[in-house]
Design a protein with these regions (language model features):
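Beta-strand-turn-beta hairpins that frame and shape the catalytic cleft
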Residues: 1-4, 100-110, 157-161, 187-188
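Active-site environment of divalent metal-dependent phosphoester hydrolases
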Residues: 10-15, 36-39, 59-64, 119, ...
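Glycine-rich phosphate-binding loop signature in dinucleotide/nucleotide-binding domains
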Residues: 22-25, 103-105, 137-140, 183-185
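Active-site-proximal segments of metal-dependent phosphoesterases and phosphodiesterases across multiple
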Residues: 70-75, 107-139
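Anionic-ligand binding region
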Residues: 129-168, 179-181
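Acidic, His/Gly-rich catalytic cores of divalent-metal-dependent hydrolytic chemistry
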Residues: 156-242
Length: 242
């Protein structure tokens, strides 16, 4: 079985549609954070229509039970919560994390959002082995796929292969109009699918999504590079581990 790993869609329906038009795999694995974005209901419906397998991301938890603060992402989580009905929210609450699947040519692969032990732990292309070793303690799979940071990578950690599938809806690859994902089986392919970002921007502006212009300007039209994001997240992870 081949697996298309679609992570961090973040309610970007046009990007998702472009990727699904390319997917040729027996299983679609949604790696968390599918709905926290401007078109959540339509995104979730399309993925479920395609009979995708889901795991939980940190934003799925936040949407299912949003906080009361006024921070930007908290307000966005509340807005998405209000767009979904109770059945959809219950679906998000019931998502597993992590999940292992048998993949053609790769054996048993472990899919997680942040790390095998947490849906919000940060792993990057430059995370040092001293921090990775305890994270992988007890993990038996030779291939682990993660997301969360929106920046693709494929690296070896000892004998284990660690892959970040990137982000379908908010790819931090330094180029607008790119949806990043991974195709697994029998090898690992980091894929980048173009989509119409200008049309997406027009749709986003009509949704009522909180601070939509910030999303448009800072993510959709002018996304940071993988190098910038990796340095930022690794610095944050180092501070959190102290």
């Amino acid at each position: 079985m081949r697996v298309a790993a679609l992570y961090d869609v973040h309610g970007n329906l046009p990007a998702l549609e472009a990727v699904l038009a390319e997917v040729d795999a027996g299983t679609i694995l949604v790696g968390g954070d599918a709905v926290l974005g401007p078109m959540p209901k339509e995104t979730l419906a399309l993925l479920r229509e395609r009979d995708a397998t889901f795991i939980r991301g940190n934003c799925d938890r936040e949407v299912a039970a949003p906080g009361e603060g006024e921070e930007l992402w908290t307000r966005r989580a509340r807005w998405v919560h209000e767009q979904l009905d109770e059945e959809e929210l219950a679906f998000l609450r019931g998502l597993p994390h992590p999940l292992s699947l048998e993949v053609e040519g790769l054996g048993e692969v472990l899919f997680c959002h942040g790390s095998p032990r947490s849906d919000e732990e940060i792993l990057t292309a430059i995370t040092p082995p001293k921090r990775l070793d305890p994270i992988f303690d007890g993990v038996t799979q030779d291939v682990v796929v993660c997301g969360h940071t929106h920046a693709q990578f494929d690296r070896l950690v000892g004998d284990r292969r660690l892959v970040n599938a990137g982000s379908v809806g908010m790819a931090y690859e330094g180029e607008p109009g790119i949806a990043a994902w991974a195709l697994l089986g029998p090898t690992v392919e980091l894929r980048r699918t173009p989509y119409d970002v200008e049309a997406t921007v027009a749709l986003v502006r009509e949704t009522g999504f909180p601070d939509a212009e910030e999303l448009v300007s800072e993510v959709l039209l002018h996304p940071p590079s993988a190098e910038e994001v990796t340095a930022h997240f690794e610095s944050l992870a180092e501070r959190q581990s102290l």
